Amino acid sequence: VTRLSYSAIALYDRCSYRFYAERVAGMRPAPWRRDGGGEAAGALHPTELGDAVHRLLERVDLTAPAAPPGEELAQVVRGWYPAVTDDDLSRIGVFVEAYCDSELARRVSALPGVRPERPFAFEVDGVLVNGRLDVLWHDGERALVLDYKTNALLGRDPAEIVDEEYQTQRAVYALACLRAGATEAEVVYQFLEAPEAVVTTTFAVADVARLEEALSASIARIRGGEFRPTPSPFACSGCPALDVVCAGPRLGGSPPGAAALELAALG
């Protein structure tokens, strides 16, 4: 392994078995059914909806944030996703407005030189780690990274979700800034369902060794070929192995290696 995206590392940490299914075995999720009836009929897949929101926010002027008019938004999104429904468009518009009308957006608008969708790359243990940042501000000594989330909170606290599901991503974002010369890196998560409940963590140069150690441990496990299912609603959603070679949440007390043996047998 010589190159990994932060999303690949995060996927491995979330469920190494799903990582194997997607990144090693080459399994692909089943196509999203748009004709299943009920409320989901014709609806965008959650990842498509999230992509539309992120692409629209990338077009927003961060120094004077304003959501596009409804007709303009609909025309743009239909160009990307012709199957989008009116309900989808309404949800997308609400998410974009949630950022533009938030206190965080006002704070970001005052940061000179703030830019959307910035690439990054750095090396750890001979592996190039790369990815993109939704929003980056860097003035030399200080840096701020903003990551938008369109996840459904389902009553959960945003800080709890970040701690449980985005630790690796947060560490990678902080390292990207600190490795680029910042002495302080603030990583901010904004769940657009609750735009004022931002989750902010600040890292300093003194944290670099700890962050690198955690990232190195993940890379070492990937290199070591440890692939075991760790089912959860978040990890299993959309997994191509689910109900094919893995029982997912139904695994219960199954031996840790049982699903791995089943997948290996398909090779």
Question: Across the structure, where does each feature detected by a protein language model lie?
Answer:
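A non-catalytic, helix-rich entry segment at domain boundaries
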Residues: D35-D125, L266
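Metal-dependent nuclease catalytic regions and adjoining charged, substrate-binding loops involved
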Residues: A174-G267
